[in-house]
């Protein structure tokens, strides 16, 4: 911090309370080196360095407004106010450890959560359906594949595969129930 006597600093505080922007800037410049050295090793989730710096400047503004300069040393009051505010922000952010970032990798295919939300090709929906389809046996996979993906009707599939129509319907319904359980 640049050497400024306590009396000069108190005069700047009084001027800035009355609305003098030049004295307010001098106070910000006075505490600037302290803020830079203090915040150098501070990390707060979802805050970048400029956000932390602005929080410190906000603490200075609150100190200007609230500090009784007749009772307290303004420099000590402001420094403790800055530290307390930043430590409060750190404690407050520590409560949210289980947050998920939109840029976090969520699958083994290096996709982010944001990719899944924006997915216009329904790639991820298809992945879960494919996983559910692999859990079916070959006959059930075949009937689902022919009826729903290749466009056969139940009658056409029963004639093509040489099975009874009722058996075809039972297999199809059984396969659909298994798929529903897997997808839910």
Swiss-Prot record:
The record's InterPro entries line, in alphabetical order, gives: RNA_pol_sigma-70_dom (IPR014284), RNA_pol_sigma70_r2 (IPR007627), RNA_pol_sigma_r2 (IPR013325), RNA_pol_sigma_r3/r4-like (IPR013324), WH-like_DNA-bd_sf (IPR036388)
GO terms classed as biological process: DNA-templated transcription initiation
Cross-referenced Pfam families: Sigma70_r2
Keyword Transcription belongs to the record: no
Q: Name one GO molecular function term.
A: DNA-binding transcription factor activity
Q: Keywords in UniProt for this one?
A: Plasmid
Q: What is this protein called?
A: Uncharacterized protein CA_P0167
* Naturally occurring in which organism (per UniProt): Clostridium acetobutylicum (strain ATCC 824 / DSM 792 / JCM 1419 / IAM 19013 / LMG 5710 / NBRC 13948 / NRRL B-527 / VKM B-1787 / 2291 / W)
């Amino acid at each position: 911090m640049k050497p400024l006597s306590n009396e000069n600093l108190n005069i700047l505080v009084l001027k800035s309370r009355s609305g003098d922007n030049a004295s307010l800037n001098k106070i910000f410049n006075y505490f600037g080196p302290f803020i830079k050295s203090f915040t150098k090793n501070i990390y707060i989730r979802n805050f970048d360095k400029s956000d932390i710096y602005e929080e410190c400047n906000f603490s200075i503004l609150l100190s200007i407004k609230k500090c009784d300069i007749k009772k307290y040393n303004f420099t000590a009051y402001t420094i403790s106010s800055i530290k307390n505010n930043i430590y409060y922000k750190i404690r407050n952010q520590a409560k949210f450890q289980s947050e998920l970032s939109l840029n976090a990798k969520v699958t083994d295919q290096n996709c982010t959560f944001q990719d899944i939300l924006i997915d216009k090709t329904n790639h991820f929906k298809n992945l879960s359906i494919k996983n559910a389809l692999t859990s079916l046996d070959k006959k059930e996979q075949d009937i689902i594949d022919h009826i729903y993906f290749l466009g056969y009707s139940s009658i056409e599939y029963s004639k093509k595969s040489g099975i009874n129509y009722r058996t075809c319907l039972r297999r199809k319904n059984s396969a659909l129930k298994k798929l529903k359980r897997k997808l839910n």
